[in-house]
Amino acid sequence: MAMKDSTMPNFLNIKNFDKSFDDLSSLSQLREEAFLNLKDIGIPSKKFERWKYNDLKNDIRNIEFSLCKTSIKIKKNKLDKFEINEIDYFKKNKNHYLQPLKYLKDEGVVNLNLSYSNLFKVLTIKKDLKKPIIVDIKSEGHGMSFPRILINIYNNVNAEIQFLNRGGLGFINQITEINIGKNSSVKISRLNESSSIHSETFFSNLGRNSEINLKNLSIPKNKSRFQVFNSFIDEYSSAQFKSVSIPYENSKDDFLVHNNHLSSNCKSDVGMRSILGKETESSFQALIDVENKIKNSRADQDCRAILLDEKASMNAKPEMKIYNNDVICKHGTTIGSLNQDHIFYLNSRGLNKFEAEKILLQGIISEYISEDSPLINFLPEKYK
């Protein structure tokens, strides 16, 4: 069925959960529970504080409510041994199916995915990895897709994972969950060059003395939303999120990062670098949440945007909810054009305007994406 111009997309106006959408009868009760939440909450629009820069409800109104072709391919080193499961994992572990609602119950896109998830990958990593795992998510054609990825990392494990999000002409609504055990570390490189309207909700749950380090390169060709929710479940855990955003012309890149310091002695570090050309827009919301009894927390937020055209725009909203004094927090936002004094200096050294700007922009990108990063190969040619 197709979405029509009404107050809500067509599939929200039906009285009952559309069980004809899939054949997962063993999970239908759980999926229907998520659907009822969705009907109460609705598809996100600018009236929701978390979505104040993005009107998803309007963006997907006319997209056909049918499945587009989507695949998730896992590429790994032959010597690395870990479990790969699909929907059977949730059939055997039904109590895990609605786990995202434990951390975020009032989010429409999460309940939408849980209602209609159609593609599943579950990775269970019990030992150190010798080489990075590559998770390649690719979509083709019109319609919608609701992929779900769950990664369980056991105690005392070091792992590296690369996510590639590409293609599509419709709407992709993805959930990614990573549970990180005690004394474990995961390094993540994420690429977004989706041509669909793309929404991903990313959860990480950090055990004692664990860490996650995420580097993101976002080059959307349409409207994109990446929202990250890090929960510090136990002490001495840390999360680092660094993102470079270079949207194509007439594209939009929207980010939200929520670091929830549920335990003492934890660190979070969030950074954003946006390079914005003609008819592009980027948004960055960062929230630090430190409860009253939580001690010795450290949290950093940093956002810098370079506007290369008068028709480029950047929105930034750093926010801190801190209920005690035993915390060190820093945040800063800088939005503007390239430094003309720096360009003049490079001109005086024999470089033309284009060459000077390229060097300055490469310097900004290299703050987060180093020469040895796998993301370097995906940068637009003019920034390599």
Where are each of the predicted segments found?
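Short secondary-structure capping/turn micro-motifs that flank functional sites
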Residues: 54, 362-363
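Conserved beta-strand/loop scaffold segments within soluble protein domains that form the structured core
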Residues: 97-344, 348-351, 365-384
